[in-house]
């Protein structure tokens, strides 16, 4: 086939597809009933856009440089104080648990030392009280 014939056939196929697609009603966009589209558009505008006074009031309240209301400041402070209290309680609980652990370890260590000392004294006891080593009289 010649290049001219291939281009001609592809153009005819493209025109045919466009003609069929133009008459078919698409699911996304309707080609007729334009008055319904206008009414839907007005309803959509009312649902999407707010009145100018409401918009300016919203932007004044929420602007970056505008001051916060007392209620907003108080709410933020309450949240901050509650978070500080939770953090303080958590660290206090952790500190108490560690102190209890250290106290138990010290008690166990003291008990082991006392037992070792008693065993040493029993093993080295010579029948005298206090032991013979401390009762020597050097001449």
From Swiss-Prot:
4-carboxyglutamate carried by residues: 72, 76, 85, 89, 92-93, 97, 99, 103-105, 108, 111, 115, 118, 122
Protein name: Unique cartilage matrix-associated protein
Keywords, in A-Z order: Coiled coil, Extracellular matrix, Gamma-carboxyglutamic acid, Secreted, Signal, Sulfation
Function: May be involved in the negative control of osteogenic differentiation of osteochondrogenic precursor cells in peripheral zones of fetal cartilage and at the cartilage-bone interface.
Pro-piece positions: 27-65
Signal peptide: 1-26
Gene Ontology CC terms, in alphabetical order: extracellular matrix; extracellular region
Gene label: ucma
UniProt modification remark: Proteolytically cleaved by a furin-like convertase to generate a persistent C-terminal fragment found in almost the entire cartilage matrix, and affecting osteoblast differentiation.
GO biological process: embryonic skeletal system development; regulation of osteoblast differentiation
Region listing for Disordered, in residue ranges: 60-117
Protein's cellular compartments: Secreted, Extracellular space, Extracellular matrix
Classification via PANTHER family: UNIQUE CARTILAGE MATRIX-ASSOCIATED PROTEIN
Basic and acidic residues bias: start-end ranges: 68-98
Superkingdom classification of source: Eukaryota
Key word Magnesium present: no
Entry comment describing in which tissues the protein is expressed: Detected in all tissues tested: heart, liver, kidney, muscle, gonads, brain, ganoid plate, anterior kidney, spleen, spine, cleithrum, head plate, operculum, skull, mandibula, branchial arches, anterior vertebra, and posterior vertebra. Expression is highest in the cartilaginous tissues (skull, mandibula, branchial arches, anterior vertebra and posterior vertebra), with the highest levels found in posterior vertebra. Found in mature and immature chondrocytes within the vertebra and mandibula, and in the chordoblast layer of the notochord in vertebra.
Coiled coil region boundaries: 70-123
Family statement drawn from the similarity comment of this UniProt entry: Belongs to the UCMA family.
